[in-house]
């Protein structure tokens, strides 16, 4: 019912941002001609609305994987249908490009979680998976920001600011049946800037 509100940004400046991030991931720097992206030019982008491009196959895949993880996890029986719908089922987070992230992240992280934890405590499962994610050595950078990055790009680069880290965490947790969301400080009393993090 909310699909008409959701969209992905498109445009050549977004392609340039991805190139700059890929360069930064390798060398901690990027081409000087891309420095204009520090003040990301949203005005040059257009919105591609989900309702016009999303396929039934995409939605079915998302629904099937969502129900699969809800049913197969030991803590799934403690997750209400309402919480499932809000914190596991969604096919997107914000304005990121649509990808088959739920299937891809499931096959990437479900074996990891299975090797780390076999119990029924969702908080302990989250802790084990979060500790594993820390070992991936995420590279923090907040010079280049723009629309939300795709789940696949985050998995490939493991690079970005706290928004990207929270998005990655949300994809990872939801893909294995852990109900997760993102909370926000519009202004942190500690850092005096906005901050986001995952909640379970």
Model-derived regions: residue spans:
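Mature, folded catalytic cores of secreted/periplasmic enzymes
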Residues: 48, 53-56, 60, 138-139, ...
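N-terminal accessory/pre-domain segments preceding catalytic cores
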Residues: 1-131, 135, 175
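Hydrophobic/aromatic-rich core segments of domains that either
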Residues: 111, 115-120, 125-132, 141-152, ...
């Amino acid at each position: 019912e909310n699909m008409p509100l959701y969209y992905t940004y498109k445009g050549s400046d977004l392609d340039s941002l991805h190139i700059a991030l890929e360069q930064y991931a390798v060398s901690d720097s990027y081409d000087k001609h891309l420095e204009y992206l520090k003040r990301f030019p949203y005005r040059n982008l257009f919105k591609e609305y989900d309702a016009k491009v999303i396929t039934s196959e995409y939605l079915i895949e998302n629904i099937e994987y969502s129900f699969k993880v809800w049913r197969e996890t030991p803590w799934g029986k403690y997750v209400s249908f309402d919480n499932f719908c809000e914190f596991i089922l969604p096919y997107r987070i914000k304005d990121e490009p649509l990808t088959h992230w739920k299937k891809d992240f499931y096959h990437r992280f479900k074996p990891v979680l299975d090797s780390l934890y076999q119990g029924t405590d969702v908080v302990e499962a989250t802790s084990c998976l979060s500790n594993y994610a820390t070992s991936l050595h995420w590279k923090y950078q907040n010079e280049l920001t723009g629309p939300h990055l795709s789940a696949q790009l985050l998995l490939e680069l493991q690079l970005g600011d706290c928004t990207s880290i929270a998005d990655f965490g949300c994809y990872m947790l939801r893909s294995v049946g852990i109900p997760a969301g993102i909370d926000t400080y519009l202004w942190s009393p500690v850092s005096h800037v906005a901050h986001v993090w995952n909640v379970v």
